């Protein structure tokens, strides 16, 4: 199973990816984790990413795609993978699909976790309070959600147009949401 989980901040992507990894016995791939691993390993891509990040800039699509290609050659990916929160724009989606076609591992499904904005703000605010993060004001959260909607809505449409998108209600108990995702990807 080769799966992408999309959803706004606070939608439960990371939580569900962790659960699905165990259930489906496949690798969980997070771009943030990939960046940290490549930097820690001192690879050429890691060095490039560190230089960009140290300058306060976003890592380019090319660097992320290079890291993804490297990650997809690891043995734990042979049975499949869950990509959590990537791709974030249509250019990344096109490049990733090209890479997956090249290595003979096209996506089986893309799942969009749908959660109402007010609930997302509530979830993130609650999480921020538990973790003691003062920077997660409702205004800042709304701004992050707007950026997500501006950049990722076209990715959702991109995969919907290819017939690989499943929209799943991301509200409810964790077991219920997991069951909805499993039903959607096995349908």
UniProtKB/Swiss-Prot annotation:
EC numbers for this chain: 2.7.4.3
LID: annotated span: 126-136
A cellular component term, taken from the record's GO annotations: cytoplasm
Enzyme class: transferase
Signal peptide segment: none
Pfam families reported for this sequence: ADK
UniProt-recorded Gene Ontology molecular function terms: adenylate kinase activity; ATP binding
Keywords: ATP-binding, Cytoplasm, Kinase, Nucleotide biosynthesis, Nucleotide-binding, Transferase
Domain of life: Bacteria
PANTHER family: NUCLEOTIDE KINASE (PTHR23359)
Role according to the record: Catalyzes the reversible transfer of the terminal phosphate group between ATP and AMP. Plays an important role in cellular energy homeostasis and in adenine nucleotide metabolism.
UniProt record similarity statement: Belongs to the adenylate kinase family.
Protein name: Adenylate kinase
Annotated source species: Stenotrophomonas maltophilia (strain K279a)
Gene that encodes it: adk
